[in-house]
């Protein structure tokens, strides 16, 4: 998936799931399943419920996404 095709939205983490997946609520109220991007996994960036994150969504499947950034609180 080329980066230019991805839709980036802000979200809030609702719960942590197994295998580095998270249920997040988008700013428009929808809930999607998101996993951590590779660079966040390599650098051990911790994500906890309640954190604000940036999520990339594919235009082909809007129910799944990738967490690419955690905002500093």
Swiss-Prot record:
Its main location: cytoplasm. This is Translation initiation factor IF-1. Belongs to the IF-1 family. GO terms for cellular component: cytosol. Component of the 30S ribosomal translation pre-initiation complex which assembles on the 30S ribosome in the order IF-2 and IF-3, IF-1 and N-formylmethionyl-tRNA(fMet); mRNA recruitment can occur at any time during PIC assembly. The keyword Protein biosynthesis applies. It is found in: Cytoplasm. Disulfide bonds: none annotated. Gene3D superfamilies: Nucleic acid-binding proteins. One of the essential components for the initiation of protein synthesis. Stabilizes the binding of IF-2 and IF-3 on the 30S subunit to which N-formylmethionyl-tRNA(fMet) subsequently binds. Helps modulate mRNA selection, yielding the 30S pre-initiation complex (PIC). Upon addition of the 50S ribosomal subunit IF-1, IF-2 and IF-3 are released leaving the mature 70S translation initiation complex. Keywords: Cytoplasm, Initiation factor, Protein biosynthesis, RNA-binding, rRNA-binding. Transmembrane segments: none annotated. Residues 1-72 form the S1-like domain. Pfam families: eIF-1a (PF01176). SUPFAM superfamilies: Nucleic acid-binding proteins (SSF50249). InterPro entries: NA-bd_OB-fold (IPR012340), RNA-binding_domain_S1_IF1 (IPR006196), S1_domain (IPR003029), TIF_IF1 (IPR004368). PROSITE patterns: S1_IF1_TYPE. It comes from Dehalococcoides mccartyi (strain ATCC BAA-2100 / JCM 16839 / KCTC 5957 / BAV1). GO terms for molecular function: ribosome binding; rRNA binding; translation initiation factor activity.
């Amino acid at each position: 998936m080329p980066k230019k095709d991805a839709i980036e939205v802000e979200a809030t983490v609702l719960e942590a799931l197994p295998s580095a997946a998270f249920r997040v609520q988008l700013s428009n109220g929808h809930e999607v399943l998101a996993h951590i991007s590779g660079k966040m996994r390599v650098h051990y960036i911790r994500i906890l419920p309640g954190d604000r994150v940036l999520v990339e969504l594919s235009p082909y499947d809007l129910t799944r996404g990738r967490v690419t950034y955690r905002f500093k609180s």
